[in-house]
Amino acid sequence: MEEKIKFYFEIIDFQNQKFKIQEFTSKLIGLKEESFTTFKPIVYEKYLNWTQSIEESILKTNGTINKSIFEEIFSYCGYIGEFLEYEPFIVFLKFTTFGIILDDYIFEKINSLNMKLNEKEKLINSLIYYNNKNENKIGFEFWEIINEFQNFTHKESFQRIINANSLWIKSSIDSRNISNSPINSRCSFNEYFEKRSSDASGDFILTISMIGIMDNYIENSIIESKEFQTINYHAKSFFLLINDLYSFNREINENDLLNYIKILAIQLNSIQLSIDKTIELIIDHYLKFLSSIETILKLYQNDQSTYQLLKQVFQNSNKILSGIYFAHKKSKRYN
């Protein structure tokens, strides 16, 4: 008899099941734990002053966001943005902080906020479209931060940051409407990936990797190539699954299926087996990410300008994936 399709996760079905995330760092050959230290004290003081002003004037949270949350975000960005110089790191830090606040404090509650429908639409449009930024103060401030990236990246790469941001906002808001979610207990990983990779911020990996490269950019023909998209797929899959793995404990009592471990748990009738399978997928996608880089670099060995550009971008991407792994592993936000 075929298993009944489910659209919700019910923890009662897995009562008394014990589970544990096994250590697997040694199997991620190529990952290195690094966090910036050079200008950390200076940045941290500026950062806390900025978060205070944002809370008071823009988010109107009046200091209700615990200081430890900002400390966690600061540490998280220290891992992921380790390759950045001082000034672009400041912008990356503000951008990531604002994104997490939007995700955790605004998008998470957007359907329950005491806002009229047209006010919600203005807020969303102000975050997605530059020409609508004046419709909402939050959107205006967000665009002020995004525009600072222009000082540290090529104009073509900057446009890709904007595109990734718009896609993330749309996907992040849409994913919270469980009743319209096409994700169900029979989803394969690729089906799940298609629905979740954008709202999980995966599109930022390769765009952020281009920050700091002012004099060159990756041509669209390369970006759109099968070889490049394969790298992008494995990087985004790694990010999505790492996020699912280390946020599962926090999300276990929520009944949505916005975590692949929940889908696997229903399929396998075991949380532990679903965690083990997720770890296998993480390792597989990371190793394929590395091998796919080798494949595309071989294609451009006779074009040193493109070769060196791609090599730099992929080195930055690998540092970002390393940061994602160690930040998730150690952060209280994901445990």
UniProtKB/Swiss-Prot annotation:
GO function term, MF aspect, one: metal ion binding
**Upregulating conditions:** Expression is almost undetectable in vegetatively growing cells and increases during development induced by starvation. Expression is highest during he ultimate stage of mature fruiting body (approximately 24 hours after induction).
Q: Where is this motif: DDxx(x)D/E motif?
A: 103-108
Domain remarks in the entry? Contains several highly conserved motifs that are important for catalytic activity including the aspartate-rich 'DDxx(x)D/E' motif and the 'NDxxSxxxD/E' motif, both of which are involved in complexing metal ions to coordinate the binding of the isoprenyl diphosphate substrate in the active site.
* Gene3D superfamilies referenced in this protein's UniProt entry, alphabetically: Farnesyl Diphosphate Synthase
**Out of the domains of life, which is the source?**
Eukaryota
Q: Which UniProt keywords apply?
A: Lyase, Metal-binding
Q: What task does this protein carry out?
A: Terpene synthase that converts its substrate farnesyl diphosphate (FPP) into the sesquiterpene (E)-nerolidol.
> What's the source species for this entry?
Dictyostelium discoideum (Social amoeba)
The root-end lineage is:
Eukaryota, Amoebozoa, Evosea, Eumycetozoa, Dictyostelia
The EC number(s) this enzyme carries = 4.2.3.-
User: Motif span (NDxxSxxxD/E motif)?
Assistant: 243-251
Q: Per the record, what are the reactions this protein catalyses? A: (2E,6E)-farnesyl diphosphate + H2O = (6E)-nerolidol + diphosphate
Q: What class of enzyme is it?
A: lyase
State the family it belongs to.
Answer: Belongs to the terpene synthase family.
* Protein's UniProt name: Terpene synthase 4
Pfam (any one):
Terpene_syn_C_2
Q: Name one GO biological process term.
A: sesquiterpene biosynthetic process
